[in-house]
Amino acid sequence: SMGSFNTFRLLSDFTGPMSKDKKLLYRLNLGYQNTDGFRDLQFNKNIVVAPSFSFIPNEKTRLNLDVVYQDNKGRLDRGQAVFGDGDLYSTPITTSLSAENDYLNEQNLNVTLSFQHKFNEHISFNSSYMNSGYDEDLLEHRTANNFLALGDGSYDITKVAMRVFNRKRSWNNQNFTNYLNVDFNLGAIENKLLVGYDYFQQELEPGGSQLEANAYLLKNGKATNSFSVAKKDNYVLDENGNPVANVAPFDLTSTNGNAMRDMSNYVYGIRNYDRYKQTGNGIYLQNQFQYKKFNLLVGLRYDDFTDYLNYETAEEEKISQDKFIPRIGMVYKLKPNVNFYGTWVKGYQPQTATTINNPEAGGPFDPLTSELFEAGIKTEWF
């Protein structure tokens, strides 16, 4: 298919048996998309390859292997800059701060192995394991969050101060999920019991790092993103007493602002991403009771999270957080088209230890918690 912004999309889907007895099946999805956008220099080129295989030895058992590979190429879009803090329409909505030689290359690979077995009409078991990898290769010219500083402390609102990020990172994620469904009756009460366990692991691989070229040159051979008149003597100044830019500013009045940038003379600093690992274990129990017109769902989940700081070093430290999370839901069917309902749910999201223990980030931070109470009537008349 073809569409706006030079969009070209090609999709294909192949499926069928791989054996005469049709116990071994396959499916292959292929996708390609190349599209521009209404924003200057923005584009997306995406390739997806997703094969799936299923082995069905009998009507009660199924084993699946699913693979999804995705290659994505584009540029980061950091938004539209305007003159000063005035009219939002002072620059075209197409304006982006990207340079022609910027890029964002991403690769994702997800592999999932899943198993389902039905013991009988009332008991079934499901298990799945997923391993996913993500690689990021980024080069971007982006705003330094201000306009170009002048020597007297004012700003040139026609020029945006710029900085450069050149970053490479790789992540690996693993998930393991198991749950058992049991349907049974206790007298006149129907029960749907769910018991499960899941595990996840997220890890930042070795080598994660970023080169940063900040906005203004310093006399000590480094660069910074801000200019201080009080510390003016620390900066490299031009003949007019203005700070010399390390990364040339983006000129909002020029038609060549998105041209290629010569980065060979930039002064870079380096930021290393320490190896990091987070794991989580979850155990949950849930039952849905049904008695005539009344339905009640009661569930309880226990989550345990562990962060590994300074991972695989002599200073490795474990930070653990855990929580019980309840949930209750109720429905009373007054009439076929009228239902009364009520819900009580709690939520919990820990803040990763790389943030909560970092005083430069303002931490430590408490976990995010939530609690929902809701009651009402749902009805359909037409």
Name each region found by the language model.
Residues 116-134, 162-310:
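Face-selective signature of the C-terminal outer-membrane beta-barrel domain
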Residues 3-6, 41-45, 99-107, 166-172, ...:
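Short sequence motifs at beta-strands and strand-loop junctions characteristic
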Residues 1-49, 57-61:
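Outer-membrane beta-barrel translocator/receptor signature
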Residues 2-4, 32-36, 47, 69-73, ...:
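Transmembrane beta-strands of outer-membrane beta-barrel pores
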Residues 12-16, 51-55, 111-117, 176-182, ...:
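Residues on the lipid-exposed face of transmembrane beta-strands in outer-membrane beta-barrel proteins
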Residues 58, 171, 190-202, 272-382:
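Structural signature of Gram-negative outer-membrane beta-barrels, strongest in the C-terminal barrel
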Residues 8, 22-26, 59-63, 109, ...:
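Outer-envelope beta-barrel architecture signal
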Residues 33, 54-118, 122, 131-171, ...:
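Acidic/polar loop-and-plug regions of large Gram-negative outer-membrane beta-barrel proteins
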